[in-house]
Amino acid sequence: VNRGMPVIALPTTAGTAAEVTINYVITDVERKRKFVCVDPHDMPIIAIVDPDMMSSMPKGLTASTGMDALTHAIEGYTTKAAWEMTDMFHLKAIEIIARSLRSAVANEKEGREGMALGEYIAGMGFSNVGLGIAHSMAHTLGAVYDTPHGVACAMMLPIVMEYNADCTGEKYREIARAMGVKGVDDMSVEEYRKAAIDAVAQLSVDVGIPTKLEAIKEDDLDFLAESAH
């Protein structure tokens, strides 16, 4: 086995969790495609996660990378491969990110610290179980339109959550709870699923993520769908 060079990772954004995952992405600019590569030998040998190193991020980058981290946590929690240990990581990550991202965008110390921890925990979870179609579609939007990855994830996540809702059992109740929604135990299945989706969408709006991607053309839809498959 050919191992990569030893790497000490010091992340400067709170989103991808590249410092703790076995995944990396290669973009083919000519074919307008992104390829996800998975290799346990590509993990850093040491990760130094210091929120002070993230404090220079502008608001837009803080918001988009933070929503990427939230997408990791929610998709990891609802993927078919999820199990008890990864559920523990993902729910805690959702909780931390939900309470931290707004203040991180405002460059508050507590928010930066929370996001540094939340994205790291989410990475520990999804690296073991994979992600979902929000990410596959976000990769396609990034490859074709150069949409920032976190922005694409944030735009796709509520839509995908709604699409997947009937296949998630009671998990959206715990997502809603982790997002800070009150009274979820008194809600019907339909109510807590809607509450979870609405809370995610509202967080995205609150941190300034756009809700529309005007670059998409109807003629591109077949290619986008095939690329995201």
Segments predicted by a language model, with ranges:
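Proline/glycine-rich low-complexity loops and linkers
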Residues: V1-N23
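A general structural signal for well-ordered alpha-helical segments in protein cores
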Residues: M67, I94, A134, C153-A154, ...
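Acidic, glycine-rich active-site loops and adjacent beta-strand->loop/helix elements
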Residues: T12-G15, M53, P158-M161
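Carboxylate- and glycine-rich phosphate/diphosphate-binding segment that chelates Mg2+/Mn2+
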Residues: V20-V129
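Short alpha-helical scaffolding segments that buttress acidic/His motifs in well-ordered protein cores
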Residues: L70-I74, M115-G123, M137, L157, ...
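Glycine-rich phosphate/pyrophosphate-binding beta-alpha loops
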Residues: G15, Y120-C153
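Gly/Pro-rich interdomain helix-loop hinge
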Residues: V144-F223
